[in-house]
Amino acid sequence: MCLIKPACQLAGFYLLKLINSIVMLSLSSMNKEYNNVVLVIGNGFDLDLGLPTSYSSFIRSPYFDNHVSTTQKGSDTWNSPPGSEYLFDFLYSQIDWKDSRHLDAKKWVDIENELINFATRGNGMLSSSLEADEKEKKMFYLLQDELCNYLSNISYDNVNENSYAIKVLNSVNNLLGEIISFNYTDLSKLNQFLSNPLKVPIEYVHGKLADKTIILGVQDNVDFDPSYSFLIKTFSPHYKSHNVRKKLLNADEIIFFGHSLGNTDYHYFQELFKRQSNPDTAKDNLFMRIFTFDEESRRNILLQLREMNDKRTNFLFDLCDFELYRTKDKQDDTKIEGYLEALKKRIHQGLKKSRKGISCC
């Protein structure tokens, strides 16, 4: 019996496996040089477009206001008796309606804090945990449904086609781009304002308005009675993994637009900023930009970063190409336009390398 032929076949099999491994390793190495651009968007992105998606716009609308009792509207404090909709009264009472600045300053992070206050406001309003679970769960889901109804009916007629939001979206709308949205609004509705229809992968962390899977609530680290577990985001049937941390840590360029980096989403970003502020763990050649509204919001974000990176923000500036831009009244227009032009060139070079790598294989 001849053993040479089987031996040659076996050798050929392992040789093919070795070649395949080398090719995959080479591709992996090449990919590290590509520009993988991740755009992270929060409510400020929608507002820059001109969409009325703020918390203050919602609570001014009939979708919210119609559920507030007449008694509550005539009072400065929360005095509503238990009823099927008194969560709306409670949220209404947390606002100084005489101060328009206070109302306009309300953000989505505030409703999460107020839901915590609602769940921890003290005993005596309800006779039992079971009652709390059923009545208040009903109110919470009604609030969520009305928010969904409100956002589903906003008009896109007045979208600012010259906004920075549209410019950034056009910049990342390519094979190297990816979007992580903390908004509920459907980005595909912006296709009419873009140079090309969106073709990038989009992760909707808080659910998607189009299929009514929005997630409203609080984070896991909040302590309150288990009967209020329906308020926790991870308890939502729509909650799922989006690998946000991994995507950010693997990115070559990260753009935050209109996200406050506040406590409610703190856990998604802490590791990134901590690692990038440490000389031993920082990723080389990382580009990072944060688009925010004005000087006050810029300072607030720097305070958030200071918390996340153990007061080492100076290292963050040193260890990556990092800058913050203010969009209000085009304060940083020259810087922003310069950045978008440089981003365009980096993406173009990355796409060229990508095509060469594919053609070689």
Short names for language-model regions:
Residues Y55-G74:
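Short catalytic helix/loop segments, enriched in acidic residues and glycine
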Residues L49-G50, K189:
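Short N-terminal helix/helix-N-cap motif within the alpha/beta-hydrolase-1
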Residues P62, N191-N196, Q276-P279:
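Active-site catalytic pocket residues across diverse enzymes, especially alpha/beta-hydrolases
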Residues C2-L15:
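Positively charged N-terminal leader segments that act as targeting/secretion signals
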Residues I19-I41, F45-L49, N243-C361:
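SIR2/sirtuin-family catalytic core signature
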Residues L51, Y55, I59, S155-E161, ...:
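Phosphate/oxyanion-binding active-site loops and adjacent basic polyanion-contact surfaces
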Residues T70-Y239, N250:
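Extended, H/D-rich, highly charged conserved domains that either
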Residues Y55-I59, N196-L198, L272-F273:
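Glycine-rich, phosphate-binding/catalytic loops in enzymes
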